[in-house]
Amino acid sequence: MKKLANYLWVEKVGDLYVFSMTPELQDDIGTVGYVEFVSPDEVKVDDEIVSIEASKTVIDVQTPLSGTIIERNTKAEEEPTILNSEKPEENWLFKLDDVDKEAFLALPEA
């Protein structure tokens, strides 16, 4: 598992790379009230993926890896507070495929 600063986990699960919010980010932003996925399926490093509005701030999450978005947590658009959950199966943001393995390995360890 990789960790970007204090805000994003990246975990390789099978052939996919799952991106989720860290507990630090959840604490920093407060209760999530609005989520909008803004990216196309094909993304490059630093592309904005999702915009999150929470009680303490608004953030735009960018991807540290290039690849193809296979799945977005669209349930979070309907029920944004699930991103405040401690459960990984609820607080994930998106899943990438076609990722350069070396680029993933170069990310900081969690």
Curated annotation (Swiss-Prot):
Matching entries from SUPFAM superfamilies are given as: Single hybrid motif
| Subunit relationships | Lipoylated GcvH-L directly interacts with SAV0325, which reverses the SirTM-mediated mono-ADP-ribosylation of GcvH-L, and with the oxidoreductase SAV0322.
Which residues are modified to N6-lipoyllysine? 56
Name a single GO cellular component. cytosol
Keywords for this protein = ADP-ribosylation, Lipoyl
Q: Which residues form the Lipoyl-binding domain?
A: 10-97
Q: Which organism is it from?
A: Staphylococcus aureus (strain Mu50 / ATCC 700699)
The record ties this protein, via PROSITE patterns, to: BIOTINYL_LIPOYL
Task: Specify the protein name.
Answer: Glycine cleavage system H-like protein
Chain positions found as ADP-ribosyl aspartic acid: 27
Q: Which Pfam families match?
A: GCV_H
Q: Name one GO biological process term.
A: glycine decarboxylation via glycine cleavage system
Q: What InterPro entries does the record point to?
A: Biotin_lipoyl, GCV_H, GCV_H/Fam206, Single_hybrid_motif
Q: In the UniProt annotation, what is the result of changing residue 56 to R?
A: Loss of lipoylation
- List the PANTHER family hit by this protein, alphabetically: GLYCINE CLEAVAGE SYSTEM H PROTEIN (PTHR11715), GLYCINE CLEAVAGE SYSTEM H PROTEIN-RELATED (PTHR11715:SF3)
Sum up the protein's function in the record's words.
Answer: May act as a carrier protein for the ROS scavenging lipoyl moiety and/or as a substrate for oxidoreductases such as SAV0322 and SAV0323.
Q: How is it modified after translation?
A: Is lipoylated on K-56 by LplA2 (SAV0327) and then mono-ADP-ribosylated, probably on D-27, by SirTM (SAV0326). The mono-ADP-ribosylation state of GcvH-L might regulate the availability of the lipoyl moiety for redox reactions; ADP-ribosylation would inhibit the interaction of the oxidoreductase with GcvH-L when it is not required, thus ADP-ribosylation of GcvH-L might be acting to keep the response 'off' under non-stress conditions.
Q: Which residues form a coiled coil?
A: none
